[in-house]
C-alpha cells in the first residue's frame, strides 16, 4: 500500500508538541549527543536521519527518559526534563525501541494488551482491537503465540503495542528493520494514517527515500549534533543531506 505524500505546508503551528533544547546525553563517561535542539508539531511526521553511530537511537532514548540527559525536554507544554519512561508514556509520548522483544510465549492479543497496563475492561479491549486493525497480517493471528510470528511480524507487533495508549507522539526506531517490502509499506502506511488522525511521529528510518516521502520535515544527525533541518519538499534536499553526512556546510535557512 502506498504511503501518503507530505503536505506542501508544514503541519506545525503555534507552540510545538515536543521541544528539545540543548540536550546532551551518552553512556557513562562516553558522550554521544551534544546540544541537540529539535521541535515536533502536533500531527507532524519528522524523520531523523544520519549515518551509523550518529546518535539517532540515543536521542530517542534520551527524549523518552531511558537515558540520563542534560538540557530541556518540553512535551505538551509540560517540563519533562527529569521524567522517566513511565512518566513519558503517561503524558502520551511512546517510544518503540529498535529490536523490541515481544513476549513469545503469550498470544499476539495478550502482547498488545500488556502494553495497556493501568487500563481496564472494555476500553482496553477496544484499544487492542484498534491497534491490531492497522496490521491485518498479525490481527488474523491474534490467538496464536507470538513465537509463531516471523521476525518482521514481531516488529509489527511491537509497533501495535505502541499504539494501544493512543500516543500524542510516537517515536519509531527503525520500524522497517527485518520487514519485507510489502510489510515496510504496511508499517509506513499506518504511520501516515496516524499522522492524519493527529498523532505526531518521530521516525528513525534506514530507508531514506521512503522516510522522506512520508515525513513533513527532516533532521540530519551527524557526529552527535544536528547538522541539517529542512522541509522534505525542498528541491535541493538530497544534495544538502549528502553534504550533511560528509560534514560540509548545509546551514541554508528553511524556506519560508
For each of these PLM feature ranges, what is it?
Residues 2-6, 10-256:
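Glycine-rich phosphate-binding loops of nucleotide-dependent enzymes
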Amino acid at each position: 500500500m502506498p504511503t501518503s505524500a507530505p503536505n506542501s505546508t508544514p503541519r506545525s503551528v503555534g507552540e510545538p508538541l515536543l521541544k528539545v533544547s540543548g540536550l546532551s546525553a551518552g553512556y557513562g563517561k562516553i558522550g554521544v549527543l551534544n546540544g541537540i535542539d529539535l521541535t515536533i508539531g502536533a500531527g507532524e511526521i519528522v524523520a531523523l536521519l544520519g549515518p551509523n553511530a550518529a546518535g539517532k537511537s540515543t536521542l530517542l532514548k534520551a527524549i523518552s527518559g531511558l537515558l540520563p540527559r542534560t538540557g530541556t525536554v518540553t512535551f505538551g507544554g509540560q517540563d519533562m526534563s527529569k521524567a522517566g519512561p513511565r512518566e513519558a508514556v503517561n503524558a502520551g509520548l511512546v517510544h518503540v525501541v529498535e529490536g523490541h522483544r515481544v513476549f513469545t510465549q503469550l498470544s499476539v492479543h495478550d502482547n498488545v494488551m500488556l502494553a495497556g497496563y493501568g487500563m481496564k475492561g472494555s476500553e482496553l479491549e477496544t484499544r487492542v482491537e484498534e491497534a491490531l486493525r492497522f496490521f491485518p497480517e498479525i490481527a488474523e493471528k491474534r490467538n496464536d503465540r507470538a513465537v509463531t510470528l516471523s521476525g518482521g511480524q514481531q516488529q509489527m507487533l511491537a509497533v501495535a503495542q505502541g499504539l494501544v495508549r493512543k500516543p500524542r507522539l510516537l517515536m519509531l526506531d527503525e520500524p522497517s528493520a527485518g520487514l519485507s517490502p510489502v510489510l515496510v509499506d504496511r508499517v509506513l502506511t499506518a504511520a501516515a494514517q496516524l499522522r492524519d488522525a493527529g498523532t505526531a511521529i518521530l521516525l528513525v528510518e534506514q530507508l531514506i527515500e521512503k522516510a522522506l516521502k512520508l515525513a513533513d520535515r527532516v533532521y540530519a544527525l551527524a557526529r552527535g549534533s544536528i547538522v541539517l533541518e529542512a522541509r522534505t519538499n525542498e528541491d535541493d534536499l538530497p544534495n544538502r543531506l549528502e553534504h550533511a553526512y560528509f560534514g560540509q556546510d548545509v546551514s541554508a535557512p528553511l524556506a519560508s
